[in-house]
Amino acid sequence: MKKTTQGGHTSHPILSALVAIIVVALIVCAYIVLGPGPTNFAGGRRVELSAYQAQDPTGVPAELKSASLVERGEYLTRAADCLVCHTAEGGAPFAGGRGFVLPFGTLYSTNITPDVESGIGGYTDANFLDAVHKGIGRHNTKLYPAMPYASYTYMSDADALAIKAYLFTLKPVHAPAPANSLVFPFNQRSLMSIWSLLFNPDRRYEPNVERSAEWNRGAYLAEAMEHCGECHTPRNLFFALNNRQKFSGSVQGGWRAYNITPDRSSGVGAWSDADLIHYLSIGHADGRGTASGPMGEAVDESLSHLKPSDISAMVVYLRSVARVATADLPEPKTNPAPSSPADGMAANADSHGKAVYEGACAGCHGWTGVSPVIAFATLTGTRAVNDPTANNVAQVIIRGAQRHTANGADDMPAFGDAYSDAEIASVANYVTARFGVTGSQLTVAHVAQLRAQD
């Protein structure tokens, strides 16, 4: 029904409401699309690399500057963490085929060995740069952002081509990637052109002249190479990184990538530099935790191969990012649990979780949470057991964990086949109640979902 105003004009309430909704939607979209870049938090003046007067933050560290192109490319391939994503379980290195379960389907990584038919053997330098920087494969194929080209876009041309030079020395493996299984509209690759237009700046790293050379090196490694934000930064409605919440944590592949901002309670603000250096270098820091899942892979195949100067530079950079609190993560409990299993918190009335823990876990992890066997197995003070979701605790129980050290490998066996979803939920809830700030309420259904990430 139309209403007539005093001026004789007719108003349309429905139309007015629709216009208001559209305006609000446009404002929200603009807010999302016009988000800050990964290093904007630092302020200061950025310049093109060619105009930067201090030490070049790109390339390899000083001790490798005289190495051959292929040797430099091998180091940078490690720094870019290519192997993990492009190797299927039991498959040939770099031959692709690893599946990534996403909310809208499953994507498979591609073959990046120099096989001409199924790999990158036919790629020119220009083709390779397009893939790394723009998400455009050979024959103009649009790549999905599971390939982190929105981070790799900051990689210098020289570094990208050094990686290509190394990859082309590998043995060609004929291994076509399995077909992706994505629901509509995500199965329409053409939409990636729009996504890239909105969220991929296609811009190389620009050093910040008001920050130190070490900071710039750390920024380049964390953003352009190691692409830390791809796991540790939440995503917006369009699956792009939300840098307003930079490094505040996210869930990737069923694993929780925790807050790595300087927040003291929920991030790494209470960690010493030595803690961070040890964790990044070997995947463990006493009293802080042991890397597992995707972070464990990143340490094993990438971070542990970096020179100490590069690890230190990354720590300098991590210390500088904006502090963001994660609401559901309390400051970890650092005091051990009682030495007697009869004392302390019990997760559930029937003590089923306690029984499972006693039979399978206590021998290595102890009743106090401080391992009587090896420091890597200590639970006290770790983020995972203080996470009220118990997500990563359950994942480690299901899949196990392995840390590679100078003295060999330290393993925690996988119990996914040995215990039911109900048993895993019970023992995970017991662990968080006994050793963490508060007990979790992990459900059988959640454990089943975690299993499905295979």
Predicted feature descriptions by range:
Residues E71-E74, A80-T87, L102-T110, P114-Y154, ...:
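The feature marks the first
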Residues A349-A390, Q395:
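C-terminal structural cap/anchor segments
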Residues G119, T368-S371, H404:
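Alpha/beta-hydrolase active-site loop signature
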Residues L280, T380-E423:
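Extended, polar beta-sheet/loop recognition surfaces of beta-rich domains
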Residues T39-D56, V60, T87-L107, R138-A219, ...:
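Flexible coil segments in periplasmic/lumen-exposed cytochrome c-class electron-transfer proteins
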Residues T4-R46:
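N-terminal type II signal-anchor transmembrane helix
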Residues S50-A80, F376:
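Short extracytoplasmic
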Residues C82-C85, C228-C231, C361-C364:
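Short cysteine clusters
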